């Protein structure tokens, strides 16, 4: 999602009634490093590389590492022995010139940003709203999550049952856990919940742009997402490529064809270091990896006799497998295919409920979006084959390779 900060601020002036919301939206884009169009293009580049949240945390509470202080609204508006309270003008001076409200020089570790006064005012307004945004969906007696999975398959019911089985009831830290539907095509529908579960992977960036955590997307993530915003339990696309490249490097009988060529770049790059070569007229393919099942039949004609490597999604797309080939199925969703015989969607809901229960236990009573996301490495995930300390984004790098014939 692209935010035009100057445009939003101009609208704030023109439309008095919704000005506060628009200013906060502009400030959020700055805070998250997603304001791609600013008065000075250098600001957008600097924020993308060094967003405020990377040092001060998604909740603005600061961090011990680098001694980043809290910058949420209550902290800035409270006078300390070292300085008076910040207002928008003093905050603008701080982020542009590195000078505190009291006039002293701020740490050189803090980047200076070429913000205009309206941009700094928008960021200041967002920081004031940040504590409330961090606690969306949290009341003294209830915590509410959004669920974006298709409504017809009983996903929410299976999710709720799995969570309650792991918790031993419907409550954690004195709160009932509730799930409500959200529209994966409209990130605004997730603003009133703590986090959203079961989004299509392609919808995650829009929710992240709203500052809404995305838990357990329904498909593989690319692999470069921020674990402070997104957590899954399926291997990322980058992780699957790495695992497949390693397996081909050890098991391939000769050159490897990848089909279609338009999707081959990532895997070919992973193979380039020590993997088998691409085929040639002199040395034809002995293995073929098919990434798009709709092109399976055409792909096989280009590599007669080659052993086929194909993932579950490509098998689903193709609707069949050749009877005259060796086939290795690439299982990049091992958590969803198990001995229970569940459908993949039911298995996803069951695992989501179990993981969420343990993360909520670890996050504690003082629950915010940032604390929820930070609790993953500390959660006790016994029996779930996940480790968010070793694999912060996905909890796993496991990919299985299954000979089918």
Label each PLM-derived region with a short phrase.
Residues 6-16:
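Bacterial N-terminal signal peptides
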Residues 50, 66, 118, 140-142, ...:
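Extracytoplasmic
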Residues 89, 93-100, 111-136:
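C-terminal capping alpha-helices of c-type cytochrome domains
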Residues 40-93, 109-115:
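Gly/Gly-Pro-rich "capping" loops immediately C-terminal to redox-active cysteine motifs
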Residues 32-35, 54-61, 96-100, 128-129:
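Detector for the c-type heme attachment site
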Residues 1-4:
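Positively charged n-region of N-terminal signal peptides that target proteins for export
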Residues 128-405:
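Extracytosolic ligand-binding ectodomains
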Residues 18-48:
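Electrostatic cytochrome c docking/interface patches
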